[in-house]
Amino acid sequence: MATSNNPRKFSEKIALHNQKQAEETAAFEEVMKDLSLTRAARLQLQKSQYLQLGPSRGQYYGGSLPNVNQIGSGTMDLPFQTPFQSSGLDTSRTTRHHGLVDRVYRERGRLGSPHRRPLSVDKHGRQADSCPYGTMYLSPPADTSWRRTNSDSALHQSTMTPTQPESFSSGSQDVHQKRVLLLTVPGMEETTSEADKNLSKQAWDTKKTGSRPKSCEVPGINIFPSADQENTTALIPATHNTGGSLPDLTNIHFPSPLPTPLDPEEPTFPALSSSSSTGNLAANLTHLGIGGAGQGMSTPGSSPQHRPAGVSPLSLSTEARRQQASPTLSPLSPITQAVAMDALSLEQQLPYAFFTQAGSQQPPPQPQPPPPPPPASQQPPPPPPPQAPVRLPPGGPLLPSASLTRGPQPPPLAVTVPSSLPQSPPENPGQPSMGIDIASAPALQQYRTSAGSPANQSPTSPVSNQGFSPGSSPQHTSTLGSVFGDAYYEQQMAARQANALSHQLEQFNMMENAISSSSLYSPGSTLNYSQAAMMGLTGSHGSLPDSQQLGYASHSGIPNIILTVTGESPPSLSKELTSSLAGVGDVSFDSDSQFPLDELKIDPLTLDGLHMLNDPDMVLADPATEDTFRMDRL
């Protein structure tokens, strides 16, 4: 009996010991949980304070340090909420688990065999048997996973959403995350973020801290809240919207690859489009399509289109721009832009700009059929071209197509210079002059001679330089004059030869665009187009404003140069080109002294070349076509 009883006694003692240990462990865990909760609450409060202070302060100062002034006011409520909410959840869990543990051990003391008790204690010692994980892991893991979920910058922005107070449930946060992503992606981010911040701020004022994941509370992220958000985002939500594990650049005012505004209507984008066109294809397309095309198009239909584009620009800045421009471009624009999109990848939007420009410039005769639909919306711009109308006659359709391509800007194509002025004016007062200025002195002079539009001459150059990158506009001006002149062309040729392959590809894309849009180009315009294609097709940079300049912009073998200058000089260049081509006649390239083919090494267009330009179905893969558009032939 003694021996038989001893094991039971030992087992009972062991069970009691284990139970005591479990209880002690549970109590210890509870204490630790409370401590961790308080710490977490403190951290959250601190982080929230940092976020609140950081956003509010960062908005003005952009510093990551908390704003001591706001610590007292905004964060007083949060500490209580966070501890209570999180502690309430965790406490209930811990008490539940502890009760389970106690019950389990008691039951086991009664029922379980000596072996099971220690095993149960060892395995589940910190939890009820039903709980697969230790109690210490139950509530914290959920919290950690939840925090992890929110660690995403997207989730951080999700905290911005008013629903975030429910962030304790990971599912709700996921939903919020998605919402936040949708909100952040659109080009309207700033406005939506502002409104969302205001709304979510209200919701978050009390619940931010509790609901916001700790990861979202990282104070360092608060550096990025935009200054304008400070008032609204003094609360954490703004910081969440702006910051997360990754900073939300949308709130920052320094441009992201795709400009945050994505709104072509913003005056800054014209400058961005011209200056940054060289840098970013997508950004250029966004800036150009949104900034440049948007500029031209914003007036007629681009602003509506812009918003859609603004939303899509992130993924399809070029596409969005295409869509924006396409309404104006109509058939031509979609084709040219669609092809241009590919070309853009090759030539940084060069093809696109070219097609837009070429399409707008060259389409006149060909585009006449396509332009009619777009012209309806864009033909008003053609009137501004009256200055260049003489040039425009061939460009008359051109104006429609240009207007189609550009909306307001297409007129510059048709008008070349004058249109660009009207284009810019819809966009920005400065831009019209910008567009004119692109041609600047040389281009303007040429344009004056060819188009004889005085308005384009002086006003454009100063403003256009300002509107678009001033440096580039001078370049474009020189490009216009020089492109027609031998020296600049030679420079471009050097760059072109260096980029011959890429340019050839660009040319192909551009030619495809030109071919697809060749119908847009009239035979004369085709000549212009071929000239532009031969000269600037490759060089046509992805600047919609430059589209008109296409010939010249493409003239510059260097799309980047043109891109920088594109915003400003291309209008003048395109104006000059169009005006010269239109005014001198589509075939003027061959005979026009302004465009000495010999100096430019541009062979006169042959019937085949014209046919290729005019044939929308023409396949550029044809070696003859390739030959026609070879860089060396430029």
Curated annotation (Swiss-Prot):
Residues 151-174, 271-283, 296-305, 314-331, 446-479 have a biased composition (Polar residues). It is found in: Cytoplasm; Nucleus. The record marks 575 as: Required for ubiquitination and degradation. The modification Phosphothreonine is found at residues 149, 161. Disulfide bonds: none annotated. GO terms for cellular component: cytoplasm; cytosol; nuclear body; nucleoplasm; nucleus; plasma membrane. Residues 110-174, 191-221, 258-331, 357-479 are annotated as: Disordered. Keywords: Activator, Biological rhythms, Chromosomal rearrangement, Cytoplasm, Host-virus interaction, Nucleus, Phosphoprotein, Transcription, Transcription regulation. Highly expressed in adult and fetal brain. Located to specific regions such as the prefrontal cortex and cerebellum. Very low expression in other tissues such as heart, spleen, lung, skeletal muscle, salivary gland, ovary and kidney. The record marks 42-43 as: Breakpoint for translocation to form the MECT1-MAML2 and MAML2-MECT1 fusion proteins. The keyword Transcription regulation applies. GO terms for molecular function: cAMP response element binding protein binding; transcription coactivator activity. Phosphorylation/dephosphorylation states of Ser-151 are required for regulating transduction of CREB activity. TORCs are inactive when phosphorylated, and active when dephosphorylated at this site. This primary site of phosphorylation is mediated by SIKs (SIK1 and SIK2), is regulated by cAMP and calcium levels and is dependent on the phosphorylation of SIKs by LKB1. The modification Phosphoserine is found at residues 64, 113, 151. It comes from the Eukaryota. GO terms for biological process: cellular response to cAMP; energy homeostasis; entrainment of circadian clock by photoperiod; memory; negative regulation of membrane hyperpolarization; positive regulation of CREB transcription factor activity; positive regulation of transcription by RNA polymerase II; protein homotetramerization. InterPro entries: TORC (IPR024786), TORC_C (IPR024785), TORC_M (IPR024784), TORC_N (IPR024783). Residues 362-397 have a biased composition (Pro residues). A motif (Nuclear export signal) lies at residues 242-258. It is linked to A chromosomal aberration involving CRTC1 is found in mucoepidermoid carcinomas, benign Warthin tumors and clear cell hidradenomas. Translocation t(11;19)(q21;p13) with MAML2. The fusion protein consists of the N-terminus of CRTC1 joined to the C-terminus of MAML2. The reciprocal fusion protein consisting of the N-terminus of MAML2 joined to the C-terminus of CRTC1 has been detected in a small number of mucoepidermoid carcinomas. Belongs to the TORC family. Transcriptional coactivator for CREB1 which activates transcription through both consensus and variant cAMP response element (CRE) sites. Acts as a coactivator, in the SIK/TORC signaling pathway, being active when dephosphorylated and acts independently of CREB1 'Ser-133' phosphorylation. Enhances the interaction of CREB1 with TAF4. Regulates the expression of specific CREB-activated genes such as the steroidogenic gene, StAR. Potent coactivator of PGC1alpha and inducer of mitochondrial biogenesis in muscle cells. (Microbial infection) Plays a role of coactivator for TAX activation of the human T-cell leukemia virus type 1 (HTLV-1) long terminal repeats (LTR). Binds, as a tetramer, through its N-terminal region, with the bZIP domain of CREB1. 'Arg-314' in the bZIP domain of CREB1 is essential for this interaction. Interaction, via its C-terminal, with TAF4, enhances recruitment of TAF4 to CREB1. Interacts with 14-3-3 proteins, including YWHAE/14-3-3 epsilon. Interacts with calmodulin-dependent catalytic subunit PPP3CA/calcineurin A. (Microbial infection) Interacts with HTLV1 Tax. This is CREB-regulated transcription coactivator 1. The gene is CRTC1.
